[in-house]
């Protein structure tokens, strides 16, 4: 009797563990997340790339690079013309044959104009950076296109006038009895020709800057 009572007490003290019942053939369907629409994500990414702020920022970066190259080219043209001179090895008691840019007012104007253009392009770099940071801002872009147009005209004027003088120095003018001097002053003519070519390159870059600014100011529909 004692053994039976002890066994019944153990049965009462042990917790009863109920196993979950499995419904055979009646399992619940698993819930899956809907598949991601990759086409929609790619379309959204393309729209962000083709947004006005996106392509205008790219134009502003290209503008900054061209502006930096144009500034270096204009200052190089002014420095080359200002440092070009040549003195012939023979001279007389009263004459010394020397060629310098200060002998011709056109060459002096060339140095002044290209120095101004190079300084302007250097000072305009912060405005170009503003256009990169704020590609939709209109006032800095409008300021740049106006100033670039003026500087392009000045550069073309100085380069064209100096090119005419360099042409006369190389070929002369028989109707005006102007003799070519580049046979005697070869180094001087070579230096001035290089400066004129650099100035025309700077003018071409300024023209591209004007086109870029006009393209950036274009309104998108």
Curated annotation (Swiss-Prot):
Residues 80-109, 170-194 are extracellular. Residues 1-27 are annotated as: Disordered. Residues 1-12 have a biased composition (Basic and acidic residues). InterPro entries: CASP/CASPL (IPR006459), CASP_dom (IPR006702), CASPL (IPR044173). Glycans are attached at residue 173. The chain crosses the membrane at residues 59-79, 110-130, 149-169, 195-215. Disruption phenotype: Disorganised deposition of Casparian strips. It holds the Pfam family CASP_dom. One of its GO terms (molecular function) is protein homodimerization activity. One of its GO terms (biological process) is proteolysis. Regulates membrane-cell wall junctions and localized cell wall deposition. Required for establishment of the Casparian strip membrane domain (CSD) and the subsequent formation of Casparian strips, a cell wall modification of the root endodermis that determines an apoplastic barrier between the intraorganismal apoplasm and the extraorganismal apoplasm and prevents lateral diffusion. This is Casparian strip membrane protein 3. It comes from Arabidopsis thaliana. The lineage of its organism: Eukaryota, Viridiplantae, Streptophyta, Embryophyta, Tracheophyta.
């Amino acid at each position: 009797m004692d053994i039976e009572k002890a066994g019944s007490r153990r049965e009462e003290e042990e917790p009863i563990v109920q196993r979950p019942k499995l419904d055979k053939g009646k399992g619940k369907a698993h819930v899956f997340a809907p598949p991601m629409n990759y086409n929609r994500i790619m379309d959204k990414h393309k729209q962000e790339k083709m947004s006005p702020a996106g392509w205008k920022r790219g134009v502003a970066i290209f503008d900054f690079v061209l502006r930096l190259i144009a500034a270096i080219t204009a200052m190089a043209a002014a420095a080359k013309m200002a440092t070009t001179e040549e003195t012939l090895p023979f001279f007389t008691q009263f004459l010394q044959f020397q060629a310098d840019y200060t002998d011709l007012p056109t060459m002096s104007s060339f140095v002044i104009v290209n120095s101004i253009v190079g300084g302007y392009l250097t000072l305009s770099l912060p405005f170009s950076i503003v256009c990169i940071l704020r590609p939709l801002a209109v006032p800095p872009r409008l300021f740049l296109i106006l100033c670039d147009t003026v500087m392009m005209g000045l550069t073309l004027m100085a380069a064209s006038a100096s090119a005419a003088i360099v042409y006369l120095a190389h070929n002369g003018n028989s109707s005006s009895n102007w003799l070519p001097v580049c046979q005697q002053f070869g180094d001087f003519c070579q230096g001035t020709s290089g400066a004129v070519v650099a100035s025309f390159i700077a003018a071409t870059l300024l023209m591209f800057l004007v086109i870029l600014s006009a393209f950036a100011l274009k309104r998108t529909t």
